Amino acid sequence: MDEAKETVFTKPQNHSSTLEFYDFVTTLLEPLSRIGKTRKSKTSNLDPYELKRKILLDYFNKWRQHVGPDLYPLLRLMLPDLDRERGSYGFKEFGLGKLFIRAMHLSPTSEDAKSLKNWRGSESKHTGDFSTMLQDILQRRAYRTFPGAFTVGDVNALLDQLADASSEDTRVNILEQFYRSLSPLELRWLIPILLKVRKYGTSEKFILSVFHPDAARLYRLCSSLKRICWELYDPSRSLDETETDVEVFSCFQPQLANFKKKDLHQTLEAMGNKPFWIEEKLDGERIQLHMSSGKFQFYSRNARSYTYAYGSSYFDEQSRLTQYIIGAFDKRISQIILDGEMVTWDPVLETVIPYGSLRSIFEDSSSHSSYSPYYVVFDILYLNGKSLVKYSLESRRRILEKVIVRESHRMSILPYKVGSTIEDIEAELRNVIQEGSEGLVIKKPSGSYHLGERMDDWIKVKPYYLQGFGEDLDCLILGGYFGRGKQSGKINSFLCGLRMDYTPKDHSEKFQSFVRVGGGFTYFDRDIIRKETEGKWLPWSSDALEYMELAGTKQDFEKPDMWIHPKDSLVLQIKAAEVVVSNRFKTNYTLRFPRLEKVRLDRSWKDALTINEFFTLKNAVEKQDNVSFHVNKKRKVSQKREKQKKFLYDEPTFKKEASPHSDVLKNLHFVVLPPTELHETKAGLQQIIIENGGLIHQGVGNFGKERLFLVADRVSTRVSIERSKNMCTIIRSQWVMDSVNNQRLMPQWSYLLFSKDEKYSWKTALESLSAKSLSNLLVELKQLDLSKEYSKISDDTSILNLTISKEEASFVGAFPFLKFTVFLDLKGIENSELYDVRMGQYRLTKCILLWNGATIEKDISSKKLTHVVMFVEDSTRLEQLTKACELYQIEPKFVNFEWVVNEWKKASTNILG
């Protein structure tokens, strides 16, 4: 099968116009919202679900009778969050509030306007609940008090215009039409539709099941509300087997991992007490890849298309992914659907780094960041016209490993380990904690793929806390954040801080933001906090900054909705998996997986952990070779525990006053990260640095020092973050030791993980460039006999004559292609009979060019372009590229693989003498 199957469904024709919007509100939404979850209605013996089903079914039948079989206009308003056909409106609560201020012609200084602008922190009785606040204002300022004449179709038409609006003025005009045409009751229900949320307490699964028995199943297959309404408009029609499988370019709802069990024993039981697979839970975005005949589509878990970012074909020059995975699939593959996680790859540090903050880079095709998207595949659902969802995970994995024949840091298969015991899981948890990973996913090898379901076939396990940090972090509540949905208007998570240090005579009443915690609270915990702090919460204002410091130049990072005076606050005892670096909090650190241990009513703000105490505790914990942890505190471990060391806050980790043994590290500033290759503790290396004149810092911060070194022996999340800031040189601990032992600062190139000074890095590269390394590469080149496979495109093989200064001469001598800017043309490689050879030539060419200082461009439009390298002899393609160069007014030299190799050999011979 060469082409993707195209699902065709015809729009059913309605015989009359749609029902009135007021009827939709009063006959359907209002009755549904009044039904409780458990209690029976006073006017009916039906239980809540039966009553809701009756209301829905009656209205659906009424629509079919009075309007026709097409219920799509109706379901778009009932399930606005599932409507993928209508684009985003471009606003959330704050933006909608600003638009309604203009639509209602409110004075910006009026109390209602101020409340809408500051809906989270106003003094209104509806603080934190935007929908109710706006409804209250619309009720009091109603333009009309009687039902409007708008139909469901009229509302949909205006919403389509709103989604397509390109200016704020247009949006305001549309909202003003709603304001003038609808009654307060209708506007009340319009607001959640605009925010794409549901406020009538009924799930989409339940609504779809009433609409049609197969609707929920079809939605899991296609994520299209329109298709459901048009394909299943007849309630008596059932889907056949051929219509219940995944299809290429039809976005399905992926299987999700179930939540953790109470303990790992239950996880083993869910696996049937049989061997299971352990996979790393990646920090990225769930993405499904669809490919048919070289055409691609990428979809997120929420059915959003990311094809514009990741690429629509192998030859999409704007793509961040597809143009780099040519040859990744077996040549026999014409159609495929993959399930995986899109993460971020740092090619300089050669590691995966935190994804969320970098997603915008991938979405912006003009971005020139060195970071790249990296698709990590863990499942295959479709292959060459056949659905694989009913196959076991084990079978799907075997197929996947045969399908992907070339892995790279653009796309690869997620590895797994086989386990059978709790100890196997705990061992892997220790590994992911050390690597700063999200956690694990435990999978049943015999399980099939369940579209859109959370099943016990996949269970996620996260490291909930380390014993070393779990009992000792007593943090003070500084502020609170309102929840959403059912938690609107209620504080459901807290900003906690560490107390700034004080002298014995002066208690500091000022704190620095440290962690946001919302997990681990029982009903009773929240009730205690509510009672103890009732009447003491204040809307956020600059007054709070007298008592606390937030991160950010404007002190607005993680800004809470409400704040509380330290003397009125409570201490929370928090447990966590680990301490991690974060610029979102003033301390520059925060907790990973924070959870409440208990509310400490026996402690006051004066007893909260100070910043110095925290760092002393952190350093002491880092001394331990192995920090023990438990997945759940309630599970008793049947082994003897070593008595936990009591950490003394007044014992320094290292002696700052130690007299220097030398001044070889004088005026150099260091931040040391554990673990180091040469020392059991971070403190040991710090001591050596101080003894030899170096200065120690606990964080990189914004020192602005030219010679700041971050000492690290492995790439970690923190190293990646600091590298992205470009504030310091990241170097291995061996450099410190070799410099001390030789009593001189050693050349840094061979020790570097990253240098903030690019020129310095090149110069040190020259220092380390040896004749031996060049000779070895020449030997490898001589072993390649490729000269007969490709005729030369250009007869002129002389190197482009470039004028360079005397100062550059020695530099360019070692890097003969330094002045070259090159475009590597991959067109035609995938269809070449010598595919493997051509890809080998491509990789070697890229290696030679980069090794010798050339710049490689991703497209041919660069004004600096000096050379174009072609790997397939194609006169038509050569003509296309020549015309493109004329269009861009550039005159690069067209060469082939052999030309690059020959010129490099000549240059290398000159260097070697």
From Swiss-Prot:
Its main location: nucleus. CDD domains: Adenylation_DNA_ligase_IV, OBF_DNA_ligase_IV. Coiled coil: none annotated. GO terms for biological process: DNA biosynthetic process; DNA recombination; double-strand break repair via classical nonhomologous end joining; double-strand break repair via nonhomologous end joining; nucleotide-excision repair, DNA gap filling. Its cofactor is Mg(2+). ATP binds at E279, K281, L282, R286, E341, F378, E438, K443, K460, K462. One of its GO terms (molecular function) is metal ion binding. Mg(2+) 1 binds at E341. Residues 660-753, 821-913 form the BRCT domain. One of its GO terms (cellular component) is nucleus. It catalyses: ATP + (deoxyribonucleotide)n-3'-hydroxyl + 5'-phospho-(deoxyribonucleotide)m = (deoxyribonucleotide)n+m + AMP + diphosphate. Mg(2+) 2 binds at E438. It comes from the Eukaryota. It is found in: Nucleus. The keyword Magnesium applies. Disruption phenotype: Spores sensitive to ionizing radiation. Belongs to the ATP-dependent DNA ligase family. NCBIfam families: dnl1 (TIGR00574). Interacts with xrc4; the interaction is direct. This is DNA ligase 4.
